[in-house]
Amino acid sequence: MRRTAAKVVDGNVVRFSFDAIAPFMVFDRAAWYKNSTWLLPLLYASLTAMLLTVLLWPVSVIVRRRFGAPLVLERREMLAHRFIRIAGLLTIVMAAGWVMLVAAMSASIDNLTSALDPYVWLLEIASLIVFVGGLAVALWHAWIVWRGAHRRWQAKLWSVVLVVAAMTVLWIGLAFKMISFGVNY
């Protein structure tokens, strides 16, 4: 028979545990900034926006080439156009790297030793560069798009979506210590 204990404050359960793990583990509520109820849908939407941006890059090139439509962008607009897609690709690669690392760590308890520490360090350093750099590129891209007089409202809206996506990825990276420079997990 299992016994469960809970701490109740003002009629709400704020933490609980059960007999087998009670001496060393207690389940607390997640803080608002780590709550997966709103973070996971936002993360999925953010990664989807970045994935669409990356996948539609070659599609737009093929369509323009097929119908002979030139890409009429100034030099800075072209750089922003390319850099936001590269930043999106790198962000997706980093997310996949973290998923693979967590899967490897979950596969065997032997992987929770120092065996995977170099990979954790590598991903933490790369996450700092990619997530912060991705937000900087997204902000620059949005600034360039909003400054352009000939840009359509869809491009302006999508630039804001990409800024929110980059901010979300950086927020999750900071909240869940993907950018922490430590292997204390």
Name these PLM-found stretches.
Residues 1-185:
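Peripheral terminal and inter-domain segments
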